[in-house]
Every structure is written in structure tokens, then in C-alpha cells.
């Protein structure tokens, strides 16, 4: 099916339409590679128990970065950093550490240190907990263009590794993960394995994540508190955005405002999350911040047969769709369904030029496999759908236009299979923001 080039016309639209139309026509002849094995990365037996592992970073405000890591033995909760490799100890920051218990499992020491202020578009080198091991990351740009890698339902299989390899070859500035991270599903050492698996990427670019159903991990009698591992291991800048929960927050970068919502915490009208969303949307000045993206886990629009009628989708949509539409959000990303689907701009199940695009991309590589069955006929609001593993890239070129592309893990190569230009609703004179 040909994709629309939202906001572009002429040669650009013709080129994109022809590319997508030709590829869509070839989908039926595509022979999908077989499923991949699960991956479990353990710590080498001869490793130093004080060495940092599972290192990952995330944005905090406009000019700070949270550094998180884990050790088996307790070390100092400090990070040394500078702008040259092999730097001498100088600038440093101190933070906190914690542990958590889950049934018979006791986590390692989890460290949380915020460093900054930092300069934009700058490479920093850093060391964790007094270790000599050096890492590096690059801060996002202060303005457009900026590129986001977008992935959902990642898991830890050989398909996951393929997805990560493809992302690593992209010149992206930060990654957004739409929930369902480790697929530990109560088996806590799998959280450690996941942290080791993603460290090569997550230690070099900020990863901003939200939770999915696989992060709940609530068990009657044995463990009654939900999201224990997720909240301990993946701290996000919720307090900085006025949220009272790590399960929903927002951040702003280079003229883009991103709202990360929680599909598995109370979203009803009058709930803390609902009231926070109302307040957060009111703070967004679309003249200063022309782009608005919303992240959920359970999709509000979905023509796959998987996960139909779930309350996390149906009830959350009923509660919050009016808020999102009224704020003129540009794109709503979701995961959960293990396939890819892109909708046109939608509001209340109908095409609407002032509604957000809806994109489902829960195809990162999880162990449960793909959701390959779709409802027929294909709804008119669904513009492209395919059950294949992959990831997305969103390059916000300027204040008015962005390019979205979906990269399929086709025969172990990252293939661009769906691509569309998007115009910011803030730049659409027919939609008053």
C-alpha cells in the first residue's frame, strides 16, 4: 500500500510512494527467516565483582545525564567524567545506590548518579565507581535535526541482537523503548542478562523507556508490589517533569516534547496520571516546541488479531484520546503487538487531518515471536502493516518536517521497508494548537 507523504508533495512524495508501493507489493513473496534462540549473558567467572556492568544512561533535564550501573560488591557511588579520552580524575559527581529483593533473589548494588551540566552535541568519557574502565556517550543536539531510534518489545533473543546491531549502525541521538524490556517474567537474573546485552548501546546514547505488561511482575503472596525490578533498574526523570511516578513522565530535547505514559498504572479520569498529563500538556508551548510525541505500550489502534479488546488499550483510549487530540500530538507510538503497523492521522476511529499518526512497533525481537494474523479487510485508516522484526527511526529535520522509517530485519540486513514524511501539526494552519 502506498504511503502518504504528510506535508510533502511533488518529487519527494512520488519517490516515497513508489518505493513503498513496490515493497508492499513484494510482501507476499517474502519468506521470513526461522525463529531465533534466546540469549542469556552471564558474568564471566573471573570477572571483578567490583567492576561496573549493565551500564546505561538517560536524560535528566536539559543538560544532565543519569548514569546507572550495577556491581556485585559495594563500591563508591561516583562518576568521573571529562571530554577527552584517558582523562585525569577531575570533574565528578556522587549519587545513591540501592538493592531490591524478589522472592529468593537479591539484586546487585544498583547505582544512580546524575552528572552535569553538560554541553550539547559533545562526546563525554566517564568511569563508574572508581573503576578504570572507560565509557563514552554523546549528548543530544540543542536543536534540529535530531534522530530517535524507536523500538518496542525488545527481549533478549538472537533477533534482539540483530535489531541492536542494526540500530548501532544508525547515526541516532537517543533511543526510545516502548516497554517490555527484558522479558524476565519473574526470573530476575534475566534482568541482569538484559542489562549486559544492551550495555554497548545504552551506555553510549540515552535510553528513555516506559513500562509494558512484562514489567509488572506482581505475584500473589510471593511478591505483591508491581514494577519492583523496573523501577529499581530503570529510573527515568519523572520528578523533573512534575510526575509522582517513574511509570509516567516527559522530557524535552531539541524542540521535541516526548510524553511517556503508563498503560499499566491508573489512567482513568481523575487519576494521578491523568491529572499529570493534563498539566504537562498545558506547559508545552508549540511555538517554542513544535513537535509533540506520545509513547504508550498497549496500542489504541490495532488491526492485528493479537491483543484485541484489552482494557489497557480500550479504556486508556477512552480516557485520554481527547487530551492527546486536543493538544495536537503529532505521533503516538505503541508496542505490545509483535508486528509493525502505521495508521494515518486518526481521531475516534476516523481519519482526521488534525489527529496524530499512530504507529505500532512492538517488533524488537522478543521470545514470544511475531503476531502474524491480521483482521481483514484492512481498515482504511491502516496504511501499512507487516509482521516482521525490526526497529524505527524518526529524524526530526526541522520545526515543520520529520521523516519516519521502519527498518525490517530482512535476512539479517536492516531494510528500510516503510517510510513517510510527517508535518508537525503546529505548522498546520488548519489545526490550531
Task: Place the predicted regions along the sequence by residue.
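Active-site neighborhood of phospho(di)ester-bond hydrolases with catalytic His/Asp-centered motifs
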Residues: 150-152, 174-180, 206-213, 262, ...
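An acidic-aromatic substrate-binding cleft motif
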Residues: 132-185
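Solvent-exposed loop/turn segments at secondary-structure junctions
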Residues: 74, 154-157, 181-184, 213-217, ...
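Short alpha-helix in the alpha/beta-hydrolase fold that links the catalytic acid
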Residues: 163, 337-346
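Acidic, histidine-bearing metal-coordination/catalytic regions of metal-dependent phosphoesterases
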Residues: 2-150, 169, 387-388, 393-433
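Short, solvent-exposed loop/turn elements at domain surfaces
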Residues: 65-67, 76-78, 87-89, 157-160, ...
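Extended active-site neighborhood of metal-dependent phosphoesterases/phosphodiesterases
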Residues: 109-114, 120-140, 189-292, 307-314, ...
Amino acid at each position: 500500500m502506498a504511503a502518504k507523504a504528510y506535508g510533502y508533495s511533488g518529487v519527494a512524495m512520488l519517490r516515497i510512494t513508489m518505493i513503498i508501493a513496490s515493497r508492499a507489493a513484494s510482501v507476499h513473496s517474502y519468506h521470513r527467516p526461522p525463529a531465533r534462540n534466546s540469549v542469556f549473558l552471564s558474568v564471566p567467572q573471573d570477572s571483578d565483582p567490583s567492576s561496573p556492568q549493565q551500564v546505561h544512561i538517560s536524560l535528566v533535564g536539559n543538560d544532565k545525564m543519569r548514569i546507572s550501573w550495577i556491581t556485585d560488591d559495594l563500591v563508591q557511588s561516583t562518576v568521573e567524567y571529562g571530554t577527552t579520552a584517558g582523562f585525569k580524575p577531575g570533574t565528578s559527581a556522587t549519587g545513591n545506590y540501592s538493592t531490591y529483593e524478589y522472592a529468593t533473589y537479591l539484586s546487585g548494588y544498583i547505582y544512580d548518579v546524575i552528572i552535569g551540566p553538560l554541553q550539547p552535541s559533545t562526546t563525554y568519557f566517564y568511569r563508574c565507581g572508581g573503576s578504570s574502565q572507560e565509557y563514552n556517550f554523546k549528548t543530544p543536539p540543542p536543536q534540529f535535526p535530531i534522530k530517535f531510534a524507536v523500538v518496542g518489545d525488545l527481549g533478549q533473543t538472537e533477533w534482539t541482537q540483530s535489531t541492536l546491531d542494526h540500530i548501532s549502525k544508525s547515526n541516532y541521538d537517543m533511543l526510545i523503548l516502548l516497554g517490555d524490556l527484558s522479558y524476565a517474567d519473574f526470573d530476575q537474573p534475566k534482568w541482569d542478562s538484559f542489562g549486559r546485552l544492551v550495555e554497548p548501546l545504552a551506555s553510549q546514547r540515552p535510553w528513555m523507556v516506559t513500562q509494558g505488561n512484562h514489567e509488572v511482575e506482581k505475584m500473589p503472596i510471593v511478591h505483591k508490589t508491581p514494577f519492583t525490578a523496573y523501577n529499581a533498574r530503570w529510573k527515568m526523570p519523572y520528578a523533573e517533569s512534575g510526575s509522582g511516578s517513574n511509570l509516567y513522565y516527559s522530557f524535552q530535547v531539541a524542540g521535541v516534547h516526548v510524553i511517556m505514559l503508563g498503560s499499566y498504572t491508573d489512567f482513568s479520569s481523575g487519576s494521578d496520571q491523568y491529572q499529570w498529563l493534563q498539566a504537562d500538556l498545558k506547559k508545552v508551548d508549540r511555538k517554542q516546541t513544535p513537535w509533540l510525541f506520545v509513547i504508550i505500550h498497549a496500542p489504541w489502534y490495532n488491526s492485528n488479531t493479537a491483543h484485541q479488546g484489552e482494557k489497557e488499550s480500550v479504556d486508556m483510549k477512552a480516557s485520554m484520546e481527547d487530551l492527546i487530540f486536543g493538544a495536537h500530538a503529532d505521533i503516538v507510538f505503541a508496542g505490545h503487538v509483535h508486528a509493525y503497523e502505521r495508521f494515518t492521522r486518526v481521531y475516534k476511529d476516523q481519519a482526521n487531518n488534525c489527529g496524530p499518526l499512530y504507529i505500532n512497533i512492538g517488533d524488537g525481537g522478543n521470545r514470544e515471536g511475531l503476531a502474524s494474523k491480521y483482521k481483514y479487510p484492512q481498515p482504511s485508516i491502516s496504511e501499512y502493516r507487516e509482521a516482521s522484526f525490526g526497529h524505527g527511526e524518526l529524524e526530526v529535520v526541522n520545526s515543520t518536517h520529520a521523516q519516519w522509517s521502519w527498518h525490517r530485519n530482512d535476512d539479517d540486513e536492516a531494510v528500510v521497508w516503510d517510510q513517510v514524511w510527517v508535518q508537525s501539526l503546529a505548522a498546520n494552519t488548519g489545526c490550531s494548537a
